[in-house]
């Protein structure tokens, strides 16, 4: 986990106030999505066209399905097991993919599968990042329709105002108001629990739903729609992936404690309270969440619901920023400008391109679907797809990293896979009912990410063709030494055994070399952070030539000047006014050579042209950089 989270969790072992503070923070960041699911889950089950009757058996059967889904998928799978699969404390589909890829290193095909699975999981997460704000805020604002007649036409405009405002403030950061997220969400879960108790007291028989017999009986008595209902009940699990993705901020224990001590009891009570309301009045199925509340509490609950959904949306947006930074470092996404919005919290970042793309997607979803009930069909595919990818990657971790015995690992993995596959299969019919959006968004994002990754590989391969071996070049410099000028020249190169093109071009045109020539390679590791003692490798070739390899984790910012200043070697001088950085700027030309389809080559050329260059990405000083261009056919 991050250094701050590690220190905080260690401190929490001896100080209850620190432990409570971490739990409250985890509630505000990790549980917003799953915490707002009661707004729309039961409503979708009973009015979503599945044919479930709002009678005694139907209500108890659905409640039992939701209860045991929360217990198995969230409590057992995610909280108890998946949270243990941390990549040096970091979680999320990208971190898990990097961990599984490292574990699968001896198996080429398995490693390829892990990479593809990780890309699909990340692509689905971006689709989920668009749907969550739209359905959550719409669900909250729809409470006004219960409080006041004739406000149906105002639901979409009000939701758009809230959502657009949320995206507009992202550039300025949420550090100041972020401190309120935890307390507000604690209040939200307290309200969920209180409303649930209020409903359960009126119909205590709903507590029978904790008996799994009701879920089994529901399936047996509804053979035609039993599996389809899973496509709706899975809405109660939305946000389970966020627990894992945000682990680096708080650590495993605070997230787990918050779940078992507050979030799970509040969710179960509220779902059971809604079920009690439906048992008392079948008409309440049209919006059981708001109809559970007493009349005097309706408007306060609309206001609190809106706050909770905004916080949930903020957490998802921040998660998209964080995932993008990881993907950039791991080489799956073109480099983008990353702006820090807080001087105290390293994780508070803003990526403009991602923010505006999400905003456009969210606005189109709200305008296209117009209600949370319509959006619910699109939601399940992204959620269950991501859960299935996590299970597949966990299988690799259990086998290769944890080395569980087969008698334990195989049955556990098979049960996880069967449950997630059942949920995913139940949601596949939704693709033709509105669920195509996350699938299309996922396909587009997967194509972009895989094209960028493959294009970068082809680019390096083409640059390597005809490259001059470093040993040959240094030997030739000794035979015919060029004129040397004062200072240090740093040439960035992806290869550690070949001469950079920028060095050859500089020597060809300027006929000079610096006193010190550093061939620099930056390696992005599969781990989130690299310890200072592993940051750099230095090798001296003699005659003023040096090879330096810098290592960065996928959660770190590659600041080359700062890292080079840590290279403690007497012969090297990296003082700012004596160091010049030479970069190559490649222009890709699509060709008929074997590599990628022509349209993908054109797409890669476009992405490369619009990506941030090495200058910004590596934090190089503007007045000490020389860029040399070259054209490359791929």
From Swiss-Prot:
GO CC annotation terms, alphabetical: membrane; plasma membrane
Descriptive protein name: Probable potassium transport system protein Kup
Keyword NAD annotated: no
Species classification: Bacteria, Pseudomonadati, Pseudomonadota, Gammaproteobacteria, Pseudomonadales
Tree of life domain: Bacteria
Transmembrane intervals: 19-39, 62-82, 113-133, 150-170, 177-197, 225-245, 259-279, 291-311, 349-369, 379-399, 406-426, 431-451
InterPro entries, per database record: K+_transporter, K_trans_C, K_trans_N, Kup
Pfam families: K_trans, K_trans_C
Any single biological process term in GO: potassium ion transport
Main location: membrane
Family named by the database record: Belongs to the HAK/KUP transporter (TC 2.A.72) family.
One of the record's GO molecular function terms: symporter activity
Task of the protein: Transport of potassium into the cell. Likely operates as a K(+):H(+) symporter.
Source organism of this protein record: Pseudomonas aeruginosa (strain ATCC 15692 / DSM 22644 / CIP 104116 / JCM 14847 / LMG 12228 / 1C / PRS 101 / PAO1)
Catalysed transformations (reactions): K(+)(in) + H(+)(in) = K(+)(out) + H(+)(out)
Membrane topology field: Multi-pass membrane protein
Gene name as annotated: kup
Keyword Transmembrane: yes
Compartment list: Cell inner membrane
Keyword list, A-Z: Cell inner membrane, Cell membrane, Ion transport, Membrane, Potassium, Potassium transport, Symport, Transmembrane, Transmembrane helix, Transport
């Amino acid at each position: 986990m991050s250094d701050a989270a590690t220190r905080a969790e260690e401190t929490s072992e001896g100080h209850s106030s620190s432990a409570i503070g971490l739990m409250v923070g985890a509630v505000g960041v990790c549980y917003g999505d799953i915490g707002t699911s009661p707004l729309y889950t039961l409503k979708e089950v009973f009015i979503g066209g599945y044919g479930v009757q709002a009678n005694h058996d139907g209500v108890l059967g659905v409640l039992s399905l939701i209860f045991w889904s929360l217990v198995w998928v969230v409590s057992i799978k995610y909280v108890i097991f998946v949270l243990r699969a941390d990549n040096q404390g970091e979680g999320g589909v990208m971190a898990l993919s990097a961990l599984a890829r490292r574990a699968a290193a001896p198996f080429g095909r398995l490693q390829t599968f892990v990479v593809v699975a990780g890309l699909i999981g990340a692509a689905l997460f971006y689709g989920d990042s668009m749907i969550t704000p739209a359905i959550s805020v719409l669900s909250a604002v729809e409470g006004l329709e219960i409080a006041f007649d004739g406000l149906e036409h105002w639901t979409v405009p009000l939701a758009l105002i809230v959502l657009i405002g949320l995206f507009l403030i992202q550039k300025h950061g949420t550090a100041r108001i972020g401190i309120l997220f935890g307390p507000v969400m604690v209040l939200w879960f307290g309200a969920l629990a209180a409303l649930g108790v209020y409903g359960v007291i009126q119909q205590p028989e709903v507590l029978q739903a904790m008996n799994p017999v009701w879920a089994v009986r529901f399936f047996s008595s509804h053979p035609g729609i039993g599996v389809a209902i899973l496509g709706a009940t899975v809405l109660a699990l939305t946000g389970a992936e966020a627990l894992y993705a945000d682990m680096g901020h708080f650590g495993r224990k605070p997230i787990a404690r918050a779940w078992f001590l507050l979030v799970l009891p509040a969710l179960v009570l509220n779902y059971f309270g809604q079920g009690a309301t439906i048992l008392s009045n079948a008409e309440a199925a049209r919006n059981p969440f708001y109809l559970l509340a007493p009349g005097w509490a309706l408007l306060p609950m609309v206001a609190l619901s809106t706050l909770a959904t905004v916080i949930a949306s903020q957490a998802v947006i921040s998660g998209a920023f964080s995932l993008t930074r990881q993907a950039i470092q791991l080489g799956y996404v073109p480099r983008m400008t990353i702006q820090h919005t807080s001087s105290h919290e390293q994780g508070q970042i803003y990526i403009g391109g991602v923010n505006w793309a999400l905003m456009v997607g969210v606005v189109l979803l709200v305008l296209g679907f117009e209600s949370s009930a319509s959006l619910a069909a699109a939601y399940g595919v992204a959620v269950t797809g991501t859960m299935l990818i996590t299970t597949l990657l966990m299988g690799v971790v259990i086998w290769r990293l944890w080395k569980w015995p087969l008698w334990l690992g195989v049955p556990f993995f098979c049960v996880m896979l069967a449950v997630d596959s059942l949920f995913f299969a139940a949601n596949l019919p939704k693709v033709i009912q509105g669920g195509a959006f996350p699938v299309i968004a996922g396909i587009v994002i997967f194509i972009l990410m895989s094209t960028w990754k493959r294009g970068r590989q082809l680019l390096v391969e083409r640059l390597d063709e005809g490259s001059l071996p470093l040993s040959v070049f240094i030997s030739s410099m000794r035979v015919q030494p060029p004129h040397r000028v004062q200072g240090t020249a740093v040439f960035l190169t992806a290869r550690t055994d070949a001469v950079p093109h920028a060095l050859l071009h500089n020597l060809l045109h300027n006929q000079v070399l610096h006193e010190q020539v550093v061939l620099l390679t930056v390696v992005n590791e599969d781990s989130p952070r690299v310890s200072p003692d592993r940051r750099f490798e230095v090798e001296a070739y003699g005659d003023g030539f040096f090879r330096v390899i810098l290592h960065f984790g996928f959660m770190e910012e590659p600041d080359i000047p700062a890292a080079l200043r840590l290279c403690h070697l007497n012969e090297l001088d990296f003082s700012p006014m004596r160091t010049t950085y030479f970069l190559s700027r490649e222009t890709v030309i699509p060709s008929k050579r074997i590599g990628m389809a022509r349209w993908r080559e054109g797409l890669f050329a476009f992405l490369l042209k619009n990506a941030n260059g090495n200058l910004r990405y590596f934090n190089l000083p503007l007045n000490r950089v020389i860029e040399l261009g070259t054209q490359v056919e791929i």
